[in-house]
């Protein structure tokens, strides 16, 4: 009898202990403000099927977070723990059910044994599909004088799975950069390798070629690429790049070109298609991109400064020239599409939307390498009206830089240092039929605060990909080190 009594007493004490330390909200005190969460997902717009927007609540002495998400068109889910960690399948089902609707998020936290409930906030589910498997990007550790650890990576946007495409641990001492697929289709994939084993890699339908890094007739490497929509051509700039360092606190690194030109490459014939209009003396042409119909080549150009001390006087305009894909020939004149120099600014990273309506670009004070320019901001040019405007709805006080469109032209991915001012993160925003953008959201992570606090990598040159990139990295590493290269020739 005594044994039974002791067991019963222990059970009562245990039950009282559980009641005294409840894991879910009870008698929560209302707080007249929304929660401070990381990442800031309050009021963002997301696509159906995106990875769960897990978040932490910022504040001292918070030992429990309870989050309930309710759909305006039905459905709900619940997370309870150290942070809001939602089930992937349940999240997908909820976003699918509420396409074009909204999610209401109720957040409670436990502090000092008491529960607090914040005001609800909304997450909007876009009516526009993402239509992409994921994103590709370069992830690079800080380093100024040598090529530190970096690699090209891909991330499934429906979950948290990341995989390396090619990592420079497999080719030590080499810099991997400037990758691009064709309208988000990785069956045509290109990137540049800089270093002692430099090359330009072009992969078409699984077949790789390593082009000589430099053609003596070009005077520089094949660097910034962009595919023709037909896949028959790839535009490049040829850059003699130099890196410098500022002594001003907010200005760290400067990247400039001693010279650069633009040309189109034909992979089938290994021919470089030049034109004197794109290789002008005393001018630098850079960052070429094709229009969605393939009949126009956009690029940026600036007057070179003979005195390198005057690098802040190098400012780029946006230009265009006609291109005939059937003949592989250019038009007979160049037009200035946007005069940034007249504004005292410099334009970089032009990216036309695939529906042909808009052109996204970055505006900075000088130069073209905007990643470290705190003043850099994104602009949108309406190709039908010629009007351009700063994207105030997505810009921040810190560097907002490189960007790309998804295939249906309703989503963009871009880099920004708005999080901490030091590291570039990936952000996504949707755009409607009138060119209006929604509040951006940061790339979701399973453990967001832990991931971004502990990460020493910046994300840059992001692009969408409609399927996983297939790339045999081990074979490719051997090919890089072998220095076997395919030569290129200038078309007569």
Task: Describe these PLM feature segments.
Residues 1-26:
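Bacterial Sec-dependent N-terminal signal peptides
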Residues 21-492:
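Sequence signature of WD/YWTD-type beta-propeller architectures
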């Amino acid at each position: 009898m005594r044994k039974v009594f002791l067991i019963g007493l222990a059970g009562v004490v245990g039950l009282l202990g559980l009641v005294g330390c409840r894991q879910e909200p009870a008698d929560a005190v209302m707080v007249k403000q929304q929660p401070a969460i990381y990442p800031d997902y309050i009021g963002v717009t997301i696509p159906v099927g995106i990875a769960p927007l897990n978040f932490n609540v910022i504040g001292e002495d918070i030992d429990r977070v309870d989050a309930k998400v309710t759909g305006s068109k039905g459905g709900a889910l619940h997370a309870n723990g150290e942070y809001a960690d939602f089930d992937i399948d349940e999240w997908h089902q909820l976003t699918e059910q509420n396409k074009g609707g909204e999610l209401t998020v109720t957040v409670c936290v436990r502090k000092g044994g008491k529960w607090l409930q914040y005001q609800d906030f909304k997450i909007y589910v876009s009516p526009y599909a993402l239509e992409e498997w994921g994103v590709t990007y370069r992830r690079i550790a800080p380093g100024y004088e040598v090529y530190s650890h970096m690699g090209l990576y891909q991330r499934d946007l429906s979950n948290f799975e990341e995989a390396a495409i090619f990592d420079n641990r497999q080719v030590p001492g080499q810099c991997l950069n400037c990758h691009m697929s064709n309208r988000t289709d990785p069956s045509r994939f290109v990137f540049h390798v800089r270093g002692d084993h430099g090359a330009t890699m072009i992969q078409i339908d699984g077949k790789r070629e390593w082009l000589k890094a430099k053609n003596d007739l070009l005077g520089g490497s094949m660097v910034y690429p962009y595919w023709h929509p037909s896949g028959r051509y790839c535009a490049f700039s040829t850059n003699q790049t130099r890196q410098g360092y500022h002594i001003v606190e907010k200005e760290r690194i400067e990247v400039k070109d001693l010279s650069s030109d633009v040309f189109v490459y034909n992979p089938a014939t290994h021919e470089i298609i030049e034109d004197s209009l794109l290789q002008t003396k005393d001018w630098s042409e850079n960052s070429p991109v094709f229009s969605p119909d393939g009949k126009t080549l956009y690029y940026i150009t600036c007057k070179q400064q003979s005195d390198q001390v005057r690098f802040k006087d190098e400012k780029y305009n946006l230009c265009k020239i006609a291109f005939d894909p059937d003949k592989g020939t250019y038009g007979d004149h160049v037009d200035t599409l946007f005069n940034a120099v007249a504004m005292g600014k410099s334009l970089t990273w032009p990216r036309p939307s695939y529906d042909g309506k808009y052109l996204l670009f970055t505006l900075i004070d000088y130069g073209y390498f905007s990643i470290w320019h705190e003043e850099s901001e994104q602009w949108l040019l309406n190709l039908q009206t010629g009007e351009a405007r700063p994207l105030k709805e997505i810009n921040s006080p810190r560097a907002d830089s490189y960007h790309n469109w998804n295939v249906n032209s309703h989503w963009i991915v871009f880099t920004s240092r708005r999080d901490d001012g030091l590291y570039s993160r990936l952000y996504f925003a949707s755009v409607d039929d009138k060119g209006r953008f929604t509040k951006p959201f940061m790339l979701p992570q399973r453990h967001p605060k832990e991931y971004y606090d502990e990460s020493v990598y910046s994300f840059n040159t992001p692009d969408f990909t409609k399927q996983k990139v297939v790339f045999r990295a081990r074979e490719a590493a051997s090919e890089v080190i072998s220095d076997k290269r395919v030569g290129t020739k200038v078309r007569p």
